[in-house]
Amino acid sequence: MAKHIAFLTIPAAGHINPTLPLVAELVRRGHRVTYATGPAFGDAVRAAGAELVELDWEPKAIKVARTGQTTEDLARMLSSFVNSARRVTPAVEKWLVDDRPDLFVYDMMTFIGPALAAKLGLLEASTVANFAGNEHFNLTQALVPADFDPTHPKFQEFLAARAQYAKDFDVPLETVATAGAIAPMNLVFIPREFQLSGETFDGRFHFAGPAIGARTAVSDWTSPGSPLLFISLGTAVNDRPDFFTTCAKAFGNTNWNVAMAIGNEVNLADLGEIPANFDIRPYFPQPLVLQHADVFLSHAGMNSVMESLLNQVPLATYPQTAEQSANANRVTELALGHRLPNDVTPDLLRATVDKITTDETIRKNLAEMAAHIHTAGGAPGAADALESYLARNR
């Protein structure tokens, strides 16, 4: 029997993109899907077959210290989440009341979801685009900076703002006070084999892995040939002209063909003379480029990591946030690539990439992880899990 399934996802590519193949699969099976997010992703949501519920939800550029994310950086980011939540919660609540769904599926990174699910008595599930947490693995500890200080004034301001949000919107404080709260059903878009402490997760968690062949793009980009190095710091934290300049020094006038995505924050003129073997753009069609790349120099956002592993492309990671640091450390731990230090030099950068290219252990591990991704189930498996969950809760 067809159901109404409502999605709420933060307007960030790394969180939206993993859900769209699932949405398309649910629509294909005859379900009605509504999807609330910011306007920047409206076309993608509609293309997946969902009805867009457009929210006044635009992510702000995230700034971090060049030595790595600090407690103040984290507090500033979390406070912006609270401000966004205050702005969009009334519209989200009205939508859920006026068009009550059979199942409410929300992004694990927004507390609006569990807060309103509890307030309105909705059947709920979460989507997890990064690591999941449980009683055995403390996700919060993995996602905070190394210098995390809970007594920092800016972090205390965030805690106060979060408590005020719960009071003003009449939602249980515990639903907004826990990072990555565990829902009764949690869809995790990574394979269990990549998950930290993966063996400890029970039936509340379905590890679907990334959707295979999910993102395609019409583009004028064509591969310049091998060896191809793809460089990107993602879409959220990429204002690093110093890093991109280091890359130009490391790989300029070498045998590498380099595709380097610098985002919208960096001015191309600030990078100085561009080497002839570099193709520099704000963004590239990442899934297409990774089909041809020999190495991916990445910020280690989870979506990027999964797409790299799916294509068996070794990773040189240069994380910008604590969340990305956890991903980068896992890549290194599983010998799928190597993590670079914050103060990386051109010589070290070039040596690391060259080493990754010829490391047979990494190649073997990439093949094994790609096999795990292919057997995880992807969007069809995630849709099966949601339908079974709905059937158990009729």
Where are the predicted features?
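Nucleotide-activated sugar donor-binding and catalytic core shared by glycosyltransferases
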Residues: M1-P11, N17-T34, A40, A44-E51, ...
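Nucleotide-sugar-dependent glycosyltransferase catalytic domains
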Residues: K3-H4, R28-L229, L233-N257
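Glycine-rich His-Gly loop
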Residues: T9-A12, L233-T235
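Nucleotide-activated donor-binding/catalytic signature segment of Leloir-type glycosyltransferases, i.e.
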Residues: S226, N255, V266-F284
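Glycosyltransferase donor-sugar binding loop
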Residues: G234-T235, A259-N267
